C-alpha cells in the first residue's frame, strides 16, 4: 500500500490531496493476445468437418440409443461433458424426456449407484422434477450409506456429482456429499495410480455443477480419450470443435486487446488493475457459443470499465472527486466531462459514455432499447460504489443488514447479467429486462454468492489501506463473532445460494432461461476465481492455467 500526495492550488491556497492507492500486480500477458490470425481456408475446412461429424452423431449415436437407459445416460453425459451440448440441444432434451417418462415411476431397487446418480444429476440439471429419496435404497437399516459402496469408485464419484444439485432441506444429499467426499479423498490418497484417480481429484477440486463448461470440456476430452470404450466420432468432434471455438475466442480477445490498448487506461489510469485477458476469461466462462460473440465483446468491455471504476472509487478518487463523478454519471451527458478533475476521470467518463453509444449502433434500431437497461444498471452500480466511498469518508460502520443493501449491488453481478443480455438478441425480451430490474430472488442469491465469496478472500488485503468495512467486518460487529466464525457463516450462505440457484431450474420456472443460464455460469466463474483466493486481483496459478488451457494450448 502507498499514499500519493499531490499538490493543488486554488485561490493561491495550496492543499494536499492524499490518495490511498495500492500497487496491483501488472498484467502477466503483455501484448501476447494483441494479434491473432487464422487462414480462412483452414477455418472453413475445420468448420466443414465439424458439421459433417455433427450429422454422423445425430444419425448414428442419438438415433440408436433409446432402448438402453444406461447407454442414453452415458451418451448424454459424455456429449455434455465434452462441451458439445450446444450442438445437440434438441436431441438431449428428447433423450432426457424419454428417460424421465419411462423411468421416473419405476422401481429402481436393482439399479446400481452410478446409473441412479447420473440419471438424477442429468434430469435435475435440465429442470425435471426428480426426488432425492431415490437414494434411500443405498442406505442401511441405521440410516447410513452402506459400507459396500466405499469400493464402488465410479458410483461414489457419480453420487458426489449428483449431491451438488441439492435443494435446501435435502438432508440425504448433504449426507451423500459428506460420505462421498470423505471416501473419495481417501481413495486418491491411497490409489494415486488408479485410472480414475485424476478424474476424482479434479472433481474434488471442482464438481461438474461448479465448473466452467469449456474448462471442464478441456479436461474431460483428455480423460475421455483414455477410456477404452470411447466413441471415436464424438472424440474427433470434441477436439475439432474445441480448437475451432478457440480460434474464434482468440480472434475476439485480439479485438478486445486492441481496444484496451487504444483507450490506453494502463498509462492514463495506472492505479487501476490491468486485467483485460482475465476479464475475457470471465465472460468466456459465462457463454462460449459462436453466435454470442457480440455479447462476449460488449460484456468484456463493460466489465473492464466496471473494474476500472471500482479502482477509482476504491483506491484513487477523493470524496469530492467521486461525488462530482457520480453526479455526472447520473446525468450521462458528455458535456459534464469538462468539470471532472483530475484529467484521468475525464478520460474514463468519455470512454464510458462513448462505449454505450457504440453499443446502440452495433445493436441496431430495433435492439438499441436494451442499452437503456444496461446503462441504468451501470449507474446503479457506480452509485453503490459511491455509497461505500461515503461510508469511508464519514467513518461510518454499517450493520450487516445495511451493508447488504449496498454491497449486493456493488458486487456488480446484476449489472453484468443485464449487460450480457443485451448482446443475446432474439433470446431475450423487454419483459425480461423489466423483470430483472425488480431484483428477483434468483439475482439476490447470485449476488450473495458473488459478494460473500469475494469478501471472504479479499477483505484482509483491502483493510491494509483506508477502506470501508466488508461484509465480514460488518457481520463480526453486528453478531459479536470472530473473523473465522463470520467467514464460516458467510460460506454457509454461499452453499444455500447454490441450492436456491439449483431449485430455480425446476420446471416450470418463472425465470427466463437465458437469465438462469447466466446466473449459473457467473456463479461458476466466482468458484474458479475466488474459491481459494482473489484470483482476479492477484493472478493465481489457477487463473493463469485456465487462460492457457482455453486460449493458448490447442488439443492435439
From Swiss-Prot:
Tissue expression pattern: Expressed in glandular trichomes two to four weeks after flowering onset.
Top-level taxon of the source organism: Eukaryota
Binding site for Mg(2+) 2: 310, 314
Any Pfam family: Terpene_synth_C
GO biological process entries: diterpenoid biosynthetic process
Binding site for Mg(2+) 1: 310, 314
Pathway assigned to this chain's UniProt record: Secondary metabolite biosynthesis; terpenoid biosynthesis
EC number: 4.2.3.57, 4.2.3.104
Binding locations of (2E,6E)-farnesyl diphosphate: 273, 310, 314, 451, 454
Cofactor, how bound (note): Binds 3 Mg(2+) or Mn(2+) ions per subunit.
GO molecular function: magnesium ion binding; terpene synthase activity
CDD domains found in the cross-reference section: Terpene_cyclase_plant_C1
Binding annotation for Mg(2+) 3: 454, 458, 462
DDXXD motif (motif): residue ranges: 310-314
Cofactors demanded by this protein: Mg(2+); Mn(2+)
Its job: Involved in sesquiterpene olefins biosynthesis, constituants of cannabinoids and terpenoids-rich resins. Catalyzes mainly the conversion of (2E)-farnesyl diphosphate to beta-caryophyllene and alpha-humulene. Can also use (2E)-geranyl diphosphate as substrate with low efficiency.
Annotated domain remarks: The Asp-Asp-Xaa-Xaa-Asp/Glu (DDXXD/E) motif is important for the catalytic activity, presumably through binding to Mg(2+).
Family recorded in the similarity comment: Belongs to the terpene synthase family. Tpsb subfamily.
Protein name: Beta-caryophyllene synthase TPS9FN
Provenance organism: Cannabis sativa (Hemp)
Gene name for this UniProt entry: TPS9FN
Amino acid at each position: 500500500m502507498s499514499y500519493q500526495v499531490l499538490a493543488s492550488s486554488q485561490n493561491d491556497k495550496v492543499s494536499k490531496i492524499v490518495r490511498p492507492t495500492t500497487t496491483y500486480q501488472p498484467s502477466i500477458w503483455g501484448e501476447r493476445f494483441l494479434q491473432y490470425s487464422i487462414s480462412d481456408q483452414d477455418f472453413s475446412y475445420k468448420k466443414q468437418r465439424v458439421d459433417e461429424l455433427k450429422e454422423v452423431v445425430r444419425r448414428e449415436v442419438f438415433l440408436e440409443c433409446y432402448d438402453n437407459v444406461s447407454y442414453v445416460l452415458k451418451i448424454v453425459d459424455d456429449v455434455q461433458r465434452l462441451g458439445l451440448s450446444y450442438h445437440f440441444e434438441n436431441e438431449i432434451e428428447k433423450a432426457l424426456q424419454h428417460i424421465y417418462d419411462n423411468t421416473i415411476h419405476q422401481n429402481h431397487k436393482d439399479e446400481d449407484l452410478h446409473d441412479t446418480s447420473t440419471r438424477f444429476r442429468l434430469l435435475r440439471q435440465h429442470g425435471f422434477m426428480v426426488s432425492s429419496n431415490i437414494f434411500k435404497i443405498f442406505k442401511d437399516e441405521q440410516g447410513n450409506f452402506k459400507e459396500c459402496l466405499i469400493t464402488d469408485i465410479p458410483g461414489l464419484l457419480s453420487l458426489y456429482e449428483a449431491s451438488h444439485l441439492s435443494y435446501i432441506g435435502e438432508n440425504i444429499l448433504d449426507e451423500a456429499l459428506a460420505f462421498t467426499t470423505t471416501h473419495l479423498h481417501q481413495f486418491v490418497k491411497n490409489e494415486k495410480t488408479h485410472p480414475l484417480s485424476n478424474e476424482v481429484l479434479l472433481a474434488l477440486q471442482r464438481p461438474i455443477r461448479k465448473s466452467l463448461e469449456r474448462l471442464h470440456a478441456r479436461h474431460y476430452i483428455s480423460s475421455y480419450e483414455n477410456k477404452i470404450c470411447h466413441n471415436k466420432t464424438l472424440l474427433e468432434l470434441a477436439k475439432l470443435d474445441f480448437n475451432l471455438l478457440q480460434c474464434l475466442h482468440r480472434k475476439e480477445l485480439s479485438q478486445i486487446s486492441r481496444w484496451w490498448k487504444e483507450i490506453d487506461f494502463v498509462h492514463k489510469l495506472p492505479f487501476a488493475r490491468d486485467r483485460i485477458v482475465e476479464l475475457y476469461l470471465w465472460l468466456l466462462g459465462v457463454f462460449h457459443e459462436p453466435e454470442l460473440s457480440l455479447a462476449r465483446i460488449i460484456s468484456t468491455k463493460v466489465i473492464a470499465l466496471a473494474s476500472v471504476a471500482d479502482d477509482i472509487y476504491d483506491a484513487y478518487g477523493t470524496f469530492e472527486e467521486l461525488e462530482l463523478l457520480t453526479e455526472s454519471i447520473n446525468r450521462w451527458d458528455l458535456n459534464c466531462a469538462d468539470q471532472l478533475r483530475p484529467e484521468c476521470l475525464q478520460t474514463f467518463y468519455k470512454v464510458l459514455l462513448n462505449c454505450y453509444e457504440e453499443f446502440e449502433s452495433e445493436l441496431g434500431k430495433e435492439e438499441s432499447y436494451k442499452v437503456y437497461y444496461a446503462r441504468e444498471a451501470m449507474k446503479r452500480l457506480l452509485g453503490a460504489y459511491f455509497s461505500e466511498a461515503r461510508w469511508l469518508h464519514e467513518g461510518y460502520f454499517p450493520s450487516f443488514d445495511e451493508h447488504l443493501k449496498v454491497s449486493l449491488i456493488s458486487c456488480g453481478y446484476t449489472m453484468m447479467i443485464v449487460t450480457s443480455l443485451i448482446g443475446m438478441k432474439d433470446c431475450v425480451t423487454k419483459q425480461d429486462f423489466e423483470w430483472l430490474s425488480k431484483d428477483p430472488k434468483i439475482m439476490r442469491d447470485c449476488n450473495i454468492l458473488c459478494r460473500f465469496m469475494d469478501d471472504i478472500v479479499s477483505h484482509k488485503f483491502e483493510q491494509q489501506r483506508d477502506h470501508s468495512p466488508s461484509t465480514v467486518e460488518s457481520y463480526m460487529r453486528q453478531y459479536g463473532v470472530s473473523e473465522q466464525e463470520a467467514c464460516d457463516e458467510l460460506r454457509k450462505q454461499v452453499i444455500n445460494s447454490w441450492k436456491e440457484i439449483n431449485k430455480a431450474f425446476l420446471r416450470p420456472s418463472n425465470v427466463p432461461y437465458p437469465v438462469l443460464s447466466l446466473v449459473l455460469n457467473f456463479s461458476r466463474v466466482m468458484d474458479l476465481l475466488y474459491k481459494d483466493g482473489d484470483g482476479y486481483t492477484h493472478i493465481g496459478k489457477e487463473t493463469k492455467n485456465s487462460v492457457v488451457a482455453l486460449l493458448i494450448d490447442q488439443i492435439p
